[in-house]
Amino acid sequence: MVYNSHMDKRFILHCDLNGFFASVECVLKPELKNVPMAVGGDKETRHGIILAKNEIAKKYGVKTAETLSSARKKCPDLVIVPPHHGVYHKYSKTVNLIYLRYTDLVEPFGIDESWLDITGSMHLFGKKDYETAKKIADEIRNTVKKETGLTLSVGVSYNKVFAKLGSDYKK
């Protein structure tokens, strides 16, 4: 990593819940963890698109936003689960409340992503340095997993763009 003097000033985390809709469904129905599954569309009429998929479906080449018929050609045993948006909103709120334990500067972006500016609260966890920021990121990841069953990618940087790139890289 290249040192930049801006890194001494701000510490931003980008938190991204992995395969959020599919992950919530797998938490609620653990039997879905071991089969290719996706959230989306109407399985009876065979219309609609894939909103999210688990890692097993991803290995078959199933992509977010592709049609159900296309996904089923790639993965005939794909289990399609209808979306439960109210449940996803509850999980999102729970996760954002976890973030508030670390900073009051939480900026949600959609239902499954948030930026956290931890600069002002780092002294509560150690020094104001990159190692402490990584420690906080790990603690948030572990807390979210323990309390919700969901996995989270977290990028750490001195600005939003690089923090987002970091969370994408950590997936």
Please state what every model-predicted region is.
Residues M1-K171:
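Gly/Gly-Pro- and Ser/Thr-rich, intrinsically disordered tail segments characteristic of DNA damage-repair
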